[in-house]
Design a protein with these regions (language model features):
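Alpha-helical transmembrane segments of integral membrane proteins
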Residues: 198-201, 221-224, 252, 256, ...
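Acidic (Asp/Glu-rich) catalytic motifs at the cytosolic membrane interface
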Residues: 224-270
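Conserved beta-loop-beta/alpha segment of the NTase-like Rossmann-fold superfamily
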Residues: 42-106
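N-terminal glycine-rich phosphate-binding loop and ensuing alpha1 helix
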Residues: 1-45
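Residue-level signal for inorganic ion chemistry
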Residues: 19, 78, 195
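Helix-coil boundary and interhelical linker segments in multi-pass alpha-helical membrane proteins
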Residues: 211-224, 268-288
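Conserved core of the sugar-phosphate nucleotidyltransferase
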Residues: 80-142
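Topogenic membrane-insertion module of multi-pass membrane proteins
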Residues: 135, 139-221, 231
Length: 288
């Protein structure tokens, strides 16, 4: 490409290099191997090796070692992509019969080369800029972005991922209101070493504590605490998706603590309403 890709080797988001992010996403989506074109010998990816020990990386200095053997999908190491965008890219190339460039608002830094590709004009495979100019362009529904050298060390990639972080099942209030508070907090949390499950545990304790305030006839305080926990409950998932630390246990743990928070609320309300000292509610009791 026109960018010097060596400059992006140390570019990270959430403690992960852009290259390792792509490899982790590929592995999580069922890919068993990938080719790595780099001049640096034996690049190590600790998280990838630990989580997917059977994932194979074939490293070479030349793209020609991979071309014409099978269909290949090329990602530059300045591409910022999430799982949904990878799936969108795979969907659009699934039935493609010719090599293409994946494009978004700007060149996304992704090429799809068919097996036995050839150029009559002598286009150099190793020149990504020439390939981009030669190949047909297609655009997926949800496209990734390609960072420029001027964006190295900036928050462009991080902010892009956070802009596309909400789950499809999230409601309007959660996406529109709660996210305005949770995302700035999550942007701070990804700089720490806190595991998403630890965040889940802390938020769960906050949510469960709401029942105490309902039980002692302080429902307004209890409601504020429960709503605070509901907002913060987005943070563990946001951090997990940015750091690529999602897990089935994490999802189960989050759901279990959510249910305990609701149980605590209903139990606290029941205790309050069955206590003659607090029932019936008065304006003073509801507030204080």
């Amino acid at each position: 490409d026109s960018e010097n890709l060596d400059l992006f080797i140390n570019e990270k988001i959430g403690g992960l290099s852009l290259t390792e992010r792509i490899l982790l996403i590929l592995a999580s989506e069922g890919f068993s191997n990938a080719g790595l074109i780099a001049d640096i010998p034996e690049i190590s990816f600790k998280r990838l090796k630990k989580k997917y020990p059977d994932f194979k990386i074939h490293q070479s200095k030349n793209i020609s070692d991979f071309v014409n053997k099978e269909d290949i999908l090329i990602f530059q190491n300045n591409v910022v992509i999430n799982k949904k965008q990878l799936q969108s890219t795979l969907d659009i190339i699934k039935n493609q019969k010719e090599s293409t460039t994946i494009r978004g608002d700007k060149n996304s830094g992704i090429l799809f080369l068919k097996k036995n590709i050839s150029f009559s004009d002598g286009t150099n495979y190793s020149d990504l800029n020439s390939l981009n100019a030669t190949l047909r362009k297609i655009e997926p529904k949800d496209s990734p972005i390609k960072l420029s050298t001027s964006e190295i060390g900036s928050n462009t990639g991080r902010d892009f991922l956070f802009d596309h972080i909400s789950k499809n099942v999230s409601g309007w209030f959660s996406k529109t209101i709660n996210s305005k508070i949770s995302i700035p907090i999550s942007k701070v949390l990804i700089k720490t070493s806190l595991h998403p499950n630890v965040i889940t545990f802390i938020v769960g304790l906050i949510g469960i504590s709401c029942g105490i305030f309902y039980a002692i006839n302080m429902p307004f305080i209890g409601a504020l605490i429960l709503q605070t926990a509901t907002i913060l409950d987005r943070c563990d998932g946001e951090v997990a998706r940015i750091k690529l630390r999602e897990s089935k246990f994490g999802q189960w743990f989050d759901t279990a603590l959510d249910q305990l928070s609701y149980f605590s609320m209903f139990l606290g309300i029941s205790i309050c309403m069955n206590n003659p000292k607090f029932f019936p509610f008065t304006a003073d009791n509801i507030i204080f």
